[in-house]
């Protein structure tokens, strides 16, 4: 059993949603077909895939449901975290009863493949040049949500040893050499590996955190960065 990650699928199967992705460049051409092909070739039914947000362009759950059903039909268990564009996300208890292979994760940790998966959406961090007082409220709330999930993972880890893997949708820090509350929390809880999405385009790829900083490995897993190939974590 293996653990993979890929985010920012940006699906729009519903007839009520018109969001073609190929307008964003060649990495997005035929992206749904490319993802299906690479997923089917990589992920087995007993594996798990973490999806750190931006799953569907739907504004309502009914509009996102065809996208989620398509994901449900792919091999493996899926752990889905909320992203910036997941405006359809509403009523997690109800959502978690809708699909056989999908678990929606919020304010908690999930045991998976000998590891403990936890995280939150995140937000832009105080080092961002456009950071405002309104952003500060959301940022602090997201730090609290991350800590809640890390606390649960730490309790699970006390009962049975296993790696804690952190998940964010936003990058953990806006500027590579800055430091954020998200990073501090990952350090405090001994998290050695974090995945995130949200970042797109060649300039974005160059200017986002990747690799080991302060003892934690940061991995960008947005669809276009991975070219649709799920990243194997375990």
Outline where the language-model segments fall.
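Conserved catalytic scaffold of divalent metal-dependent phosphoesterases
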Residues: 9-14, 86-177
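Short amphipathic alpha-helix with an adjacent loop that forms part of the alpha/beta core around
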Residues: 40-41, 153-157, 233-234
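Active-site environment of divalent metal-dependent phosphoester hydrolases
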Residues: 10-17, 57-62, 84-92, 111, ...
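Short, hydrophobic/glycine-enriched beta-strand segments
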Residues: 2-8
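Core catalytic region of metal-dependent phosphoesterases/phosphodiesterases
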Residues: 2, 16-112, 178-191, 214-215, ...
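Short, basic/aromatic-enriched C-terminal tail that caps enzymatic domains
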Residues: 216-234
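Generic enzyme active-site microenvironment
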Residues: 6, 52-53, 81, 167, ...
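Short, Asp-centered acidic motifs that coordinate Mg2+ and/or phosphate
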Residues: 48, 163-165, 193
